[in-house]
Amino acid sequence: MEEPAAPSEAHEAAGAQAGAEAAREGVSGPDLPVCEPSGESAAPDSALPHAARGWAPFPVAPVPAHLRRGGLRPAPASGGGAWPSPLPSRSSGIWTKQIICRYYIHGQCKEGENCRYSHDLSGRKMATEGGVSPPGASAGGGPSTAAHIEPPTQEVAEAPPAASSLSLPVIGSAAERGFFEAERDNADRGAAGGAGVESWADAIEFVPGQPYRGRWVASAPEAPLQSSETERKQMAVGSGLRFCYYASRGVCFRGESCMYLHGDICDMCGLQTLHPMDAAQREEHMRACIEAHEKDMELSFAVQRGMDKVCGICMEVVYEKANPNDRRFGILSNCNHSFCIRCIRRWRSARQFENRIVKSCPQCRVTSELVIPSEFWVEEEEEKQKLIQQYKEAMSNKACRYFAEGRGNCPFGDTCFYKHEYPEGWGDEPPGPGGGSFSAYWHQLVEPVRMGEGNMLYKSIKKELVVLRLASLLFKRFLSLRDELPFSEDQWDLLHYELEEYFNLIL
C-alpha cells in the first residue's frame, strides 16, 4: 500500500479560495485545522479538483494563511461520508514550527537558528501566566493572538545571556519560589539569549563526590571577587570541607581547582595535613607527628648500637651476614657478649660437653638459662628484662609440641615457656606420673597416640613406623633398669635432650 501523496495544487487553490471567502465574511478560524459541521460555502469550490480526478466531493473547512503556506491539508467533515484525507507530508518540516523545541526551553538546543522546531516562547509564557488556555487558543473561540505577540525590546535587551544563567546552579531557588516560576524565568533568559549553544558548551564539569545542584538558576547579584586562599578558608570553616586525600599524601593533580580542602604543610611530616583555621586539629596532628618521630629516633639508635657488633664465635658482623635469617642477635640473659642466633644455638646444643659448660657464655663462662633472639642489640639491664618478658609472653601463646603428643606431660615441666593444652576432641586429661608407677608412665608415653577419630602413629610411612617401634622397645628396656642404676643430673638432662631430638624427628 503506497503512502498518500502531498496535497495537490488544485486542492491548495481550493483551500486558498475558501480561506479568502471566510476572511471577507469576517469569520476567523482557530490555529489548527478543525472540521466544521457543514461545508456549504466550501463545497462547490473544493469539489471541482476531486471531480476532475474521479474523487467524491467533500466539504473543506477554511484554512488559516500560515497553514496554507505550509501545505497542510484540512480535515474532512465528519458527516461528509467521503474518503479520509491523506496525512500531511513531513518532508517540508513546516509543521514542526508549531511545536516548541524542548531543548530550547532548557537552554540546551545545539541547532540554533537551524532548528526545525519553534524557538518562540511568547505563547508559552502567556499560557503559563493565564494558566487555562493552551498556546494558540483563546477563551472566547476567537483568533489566538499569542502566536503573533513578540517579547518587548526592553526585556530582550535587559535579559542576561543564557550561558551565564547556567554557570553555577543553586538548589534552593526553585524550591522557594516554585518550580514553574523558576522555569518561566529561565525560559525568558533562554529566549533573550537566542540559541542555547553557549549554555551547554560552558556547563560546569561533573566531579565525583560533588553535591547535586539543581537545573535552574536563582537570580542573585554577583559577589565581589575574593582571593582563592580567603575563599577556601571561609568554605572550610563554614561547610566543614574534608581534606583532599591526594594532597594529604603527596600531590593533588587538580591543584587549586580541587573541591576538597588543601591544608597547610606540616614541618614534621611534610604533608598538607594542617587545617588552616582549626587550632585543635593542628595541635593534635603535631603531637602525633612528634610521637612518631620519637619512635623513629629510638629505632634508629637501636640499629646504630648493633651496626658494628661482631659474633664472638664466627667473628662476622651480625648485620652483614649473607643469610637474612642469621642477621639476629642471640641475647644471653646473664651476659653482655654479642653472638648471632645461629652460632649460640649451635653452641648450646653440643652434647660432647657437660650441661653447665654448654649453658655458659663461650667467652666469660657465665651461665645463662635463656637465649632470646632479637633484631636489635640490647645491653642495658632494664631493656634486657623487658625483652625477656616480651619473649615469654610471645611463647606462652604457642602450643607445646611435647605436651599434647606426650599425653599431658612435657619433659621441661613447669620451666617450659610454651602453652600446655589439649587439642579439641581429645576428651579428658590423661593421668599424670602420680597415677601409677614410673615405668608404667613411660611405657604409656611411647605407645601409639589416639589422634582425632582414628588410631594412627606419628606418621604413616612404613620406615618411621619401624623406627618408632624400635625406640619403644629401647625405652622400655632402659626404664626397667632405672631403679637399679644411679643417674646424675647431667645424665637426666641428656635424656631430656635426646627425647626432644627424638620427638623432633618423629613429629
Swiss-Prot record:
Zn-finger segments (C3H1-type): 95-122, 238-265, 394-423
Ranges in coiled-coil conformation: none
Pathway where this protein functions: Protein modification; protein ubiquitination
Gene Ontology molecular-function annotations: identical protein binding; RNA binding; ubiquitin protein ligase activity; zinc ion binding
Biased amino acid composition, Low complexity: 1-21
EC number: 2.3.2.27
Keyword Transmembrane helix: no
Stored PANTHER family: E3 UBIQUITIN-PROTEIN LIGASE MAKORIN-3-RELATED, MAKORIN-RELATED
Associated pathology: Precocious puberty, central 2: A condition defined as the development of secondary sexual characteristics in boys and girls at a chronological age that is 2.5 standard deviations below the mean age at onset of puberty in the population. Central precocious puberty results from premature activation of the hypothalamic-pituitary-gonadal axis.
Entry protein name: E3 ubiquitin-protein ligase makorin-3
Lineage of source species: Eukaryota, Metazoa, Chordata, Craniata, Vertebrata
